[in-house]
Every structure is written in C-alpha cells, then in structure tokens.
C-alpha cells in the first residue's frame, strides 16, 4: 500500500483556534512539557501561526484492513472537535474515525538521581530505562534498556558495571548527558550532542565495542576472534594502501577520464588517493587486486 501527502487548511486552523480552551495542553489539564520534535497539531497552529498549512502523512496501518494513520495530526482535543478537524481536510471529508487521538502525561525520574549504570541512587538495585528516565524516542529507550539490563545482570554477579564513555558510543553520550546535566524536557539523542560524532559511525560500531562485549559475555569467543581478525585485516589493508603508489601513465589517465574523475598531477599512494571524495576502493581495484572481503573494505 502507498502513503499519501495531504495538508491542513485555513478551515482546519480556525476550528483548532476556536477550540484551544478544550485542548488538554492549552486548557490547563496537562502541565508537563511535551516532546520538542513531534508537537501536536494545535501546538503547530499556535507556535507557527504564520504558516498557511501543515503537511500530514496518510499511512496505511495494515495490509489487510482499511485503517489509516494520520501522521502529524496528534491532538488532545475532544472527540467532537476531532471529527470537525479531520473532516476539514481535503480528501477526508467523509472519513470515519475508528480510534480517537488522546494526550498522555506521565511522571519521570529526575535523571540526576540515576547512576551512569542506570541504577537509582536512592533505591538500590532499581535499574530504569526509557521515558521514565526523561527521554523520548525508540532508539533512546532501547539503548538505555540494553545498558540497564546488562548492568542489572552484572550486579547480580557482583561484577563491575558497564559504563560507556562519550567517545565509545551515542549511548554513552545520552547517559552522560542525563546523569550529569539532567533534563527539563523529553531528551532526544542528536548527532550534534556528540563531540566524537565523526568516529561514532555505524560502520565501526563492532570494532569500537568489541572488547566491552567480550568482557561482559554478550558475544561468543568465536565472534570475538572474527572481529579481531577483521581488525587485523583492516590494518593490513591500510598499510598496503599507504605503502603502494599509483603512478600516472597513459592507461591510468584513460581510466580516470572514462570515469569522469580528475587525473592527479603526480603519483599518490592509494591511501591518500582515497581521501578524494570521488575515489572508492572499487575504483582503485582498476589498478590493484585486493583480495579482501567486502566487510573489510567497507
């Protein structure tokens, strides 16, 4: 099934403005701070009053049923107002609402009372993760969940907690921010929060975290040896590229021109050549034979 785009209009906005006092968020029924990056539709109308329309996504909820989810239209308005809001949208004039929107408000622990292991400082042996720690988002919750679970298990075995540093992983940045700075709104992990973001890449996560995983037993000896072998092969390939030079010949020039790539003025070692954004290992294999797996090349 396909997804579709649609937009709010002035009638939608007027219905919302006329009923703001009935909204849980604007009527004073809820006092908590909502997530910054997914505001309700009434929040959008108030905060971005200069916008003539807001984009919405119509998403199928199932391959087997005719239910659709209206993404970007979250609200805490009463049901009768929701009916008017939905029917004001072009294309949904005759839509039937099967599940009405609603707002939730929940309590959260002050993350300053949580240890870097995600154990509570006040209640020993209580490990928490996710929204209750003041975060928002699936990945944020999952990241805390695996750390909390690992550390709860380690504590049962009287072993030292797993504490990831800010230079180790985004999880390390997230937890460090929470337990040292606290938060006054639902916390989201952003790349801009990580000062080591250039080395916290998806393609080196296995090598970054392999020793931790091995020490706490979350990977097998066989998996660990495979990672060590991969690391050794990467070092071997890097050294080879640094020690071998591409000399500019007529044949080399022809290959560069055929690929619409500027020909180097002088010979370069392959490692330095790879620093050019248009050069890949696949292109370099026009000149040398690399007998390494794709995993190592990546």
Residue ranges of model-derived segments:
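Terminal amphipathic helices with adjacent charged low-complexity linkers/tails
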Residues: 40-56, 65, 77, 228-232, ...
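A glycine-rich phosphate-binding loop feature that marks nucleotide/adenosyl-phosphate handling sites
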Residues: 32-39, 100-109, 161-178, 192-194, ...
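Extended, charge-enriched "interface" segments that sit outside catalytic cores
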Residues: 193, 210-298
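Mobile "lid/hinge" segments at catalytic clefts and subdomain interfaces of large enzymes
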Residues: 175, 183, 187-215, 220-222
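Rossmann-like dinucleotide-binding core of oxidoreductases
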Residues: 1-63
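Glycine-rich phosphate/pyrophosphate-binding beta-alpha loops
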Residues: 131-139, 195-197
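Internal hydrophobic alpha-helix adjacent to the cofactor/substrate pocket in enzyme cavities
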Residues: 141-162
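A glycine-rich dinucleotide-binding beta-alpha-beta segment and adjacent secondary-structure elements
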Residues: 57, 69-135, 163-176, 295-298
């Amino acid at each position: 099934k396909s997804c579709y785009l649609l937009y709010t209009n002035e009638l939608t906005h007027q219905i919302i403005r006329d009923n703001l006092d009935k909204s849980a968020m604007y009527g004073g029924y809820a006092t908590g701070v909502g997530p910054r990056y997914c505001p309700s539709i009434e929040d959008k109308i108030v905060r971005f009053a200069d916008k003539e329309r807001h984009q919405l996504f119509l998403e199928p909820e199932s391959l087997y049923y005719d239910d659709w989810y209206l993404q970007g239209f979250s609200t805490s308005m009463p049901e009768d107002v929701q009916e008017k809001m939905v029917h004001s949208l072009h294309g949904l004039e005759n839509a039937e609402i099967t599940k009405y929107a609603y707002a939730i408000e929940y309590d959260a622990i002050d993350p300053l009372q949580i240890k870097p292991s995600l154990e509570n400082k006040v209640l020993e042996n209580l490990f928490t993760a996710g929204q209750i720690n003041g975060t928002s988002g699936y990945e944020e919750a999952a990241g805390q969940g695996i750390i909390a679970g690992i550390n709860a298990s380690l504590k049962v075995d009287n072993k030292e907690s797993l504490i990831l540093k800010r230079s180790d992983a985004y999880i390390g940045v997230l937890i460090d921010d929470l337990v040292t700075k606290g938060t006054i709104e639902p916390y989201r992990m952003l790349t801009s929060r990580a000062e080591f973001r250039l080395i916290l890449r998806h393609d080196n996560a296995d090598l970054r975290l392999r020793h931790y995983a091995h020490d706490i037993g979350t990977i097998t000896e066989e998996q660990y040896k495979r990672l060590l072998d991969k690391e050794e092969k990467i070092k071997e390939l890097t050294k080879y590229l640094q020690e071998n030079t591409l000399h500019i010949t007529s044949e080399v020039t022809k290959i560069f021109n055929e690929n619409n790539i500027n020909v180097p003025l002088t010979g370069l070692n392959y490692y330095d050549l790879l620093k050019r954004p248009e050069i890949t290992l696949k292109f370099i294999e026009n000149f040398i034979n690399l007998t390494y797996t794709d995993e190592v090349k990546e």
